[in-house]
């Protein structure tokens, strides 16, 4: 199988640039190639291998109908996280991680329900008959909920996998996933402890192009996995016997959409 991304793509996106040598986590030493002008250079041979591993893992979970949550609240990640999660038909948090998003899922669901209620009120004419001051307050509440919960509004359950950009910044999200045993796939820079991460992708987590490249690869894996899931579905015809039992008379694969 060809590599998910090429060395050229990684270099062009600046995936190899780590943090300053004085800001490093020694546990990332196995993923560092060298240092240049006070900056650690990530070993892209290892990045390629681990990105392939991450891709295959995400694809396999997608084939089983898995739910994925993309997390990246730093400015450089916000757009890519939302766009790539949406492209893959998945969910995202790209503003602030609300504590308990995973570990207190019931409470989060109640806030999502409130968001949906407010959206419905804004669309069904309810806002038109309420006092302007009340509408302003409700609109403010709706906008705030949309900002923080819009990306998980339709998430049916707790996710099967978290994909995280900068687990150092998103340490609360990673910790909640660890508590619940949810696997974490993450872009891990040279200043970060890789231990809480199940599938490490050693990479620059500060460059917009690097984030877009790797988040895009993870979305591609999900899309491919979901396609495989669709391809494997079959139509089964049954015949009812005189004794009331049923037997399969034909089974054929569904045509691709």
Swiss-Prot record:
Matches recorded under InterPro entries: Ribosomal_uS2, Ribosomal_uS2_bac/mit/plastid, Ribosomal_uS2_CS, Ribosomal_uS2_flav_dom_sf
Entries under PROSITE patterns matching the protein: RIBOSOMAL_S2_1, RIBOSOMAL_S2_2
UniProt keyword Disulfide bond present: no
GO biological process, one term: translation
Presence of the UniProt keyword Ribonucleoprotein in the record: yes
Pfam family for this entry, one: Ribosomal_S2
Family annotation (CDD domains): RPS2
Disordered: annotated span: 226-257
Listed GO CC annotations: cytosolic small ribosomal subunit
Annotated keywords: Ribonucleoprotein, Ribosomal protein
Biased composition (Acidic residues): 244-257
Single GO term (MF): structural constituent of ribosome
Family listed: Belongs to the universal ribosomal protein uS2 family.
NCBIfam families in the cross-refs: rpsB_bact
Protein name: Small ribosomal subunit protein uS2
Source organism: Lactobacillus helveticus (strain DPC 4571)
Gene that encodes the chain: rpsB
């Amino acid at each position: 199988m060809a590599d998910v991304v090429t060395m050229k793509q990684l270099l062009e996106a600046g995936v190899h640039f780590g943090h300053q040598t004085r800001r490093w986590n020694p546990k990332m030493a196995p993923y560092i190639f060298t240092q240049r002008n006070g900056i650690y250079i990530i070993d892209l041979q290892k990045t390629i291998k681990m990105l392939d591993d991450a891709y295959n893992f995400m694809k396999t979970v997608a084939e089983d109908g898995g739910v994925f949550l993309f997390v990246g609240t730093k400015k450089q990640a916000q757009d890519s996280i939302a766009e790539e999660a949406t492209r893959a038909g998945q969910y995202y948090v790209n503003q602030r991680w609300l504590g308990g998003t995973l570990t207190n899922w019931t409470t989060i669901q109640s806030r999502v329900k409130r968001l949906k209620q407010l959206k419905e009120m804004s669309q069904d004419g309810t806002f038109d008959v309420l006092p302007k001051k009340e509408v302003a307050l409700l609109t403010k509440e709706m906008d705030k909920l949309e900002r923080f919960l819009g990306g998980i509004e339709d998430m049916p359950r707790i996710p099967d996998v978290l994909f995280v950009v900068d687990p150092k910044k998103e340490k609360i999200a990673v910790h909640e996933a660890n508590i619940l045993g949810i696997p974490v796939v993450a872009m891990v820079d040279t200043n970060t402890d890789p231990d809480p991460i199940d599938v490490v992708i050693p990479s620059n987590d500060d460059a917009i192009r690097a984030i877009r490249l790797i988040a895009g690869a993870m979305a591609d894996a999900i899309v491919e996995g979901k396609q495989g899931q669709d391809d494997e579905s079959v139509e089964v015809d049954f015949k009812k016997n005189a004794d009331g039992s049923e037997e399969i008379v034909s089974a054929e694969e569904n045509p691709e959409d």
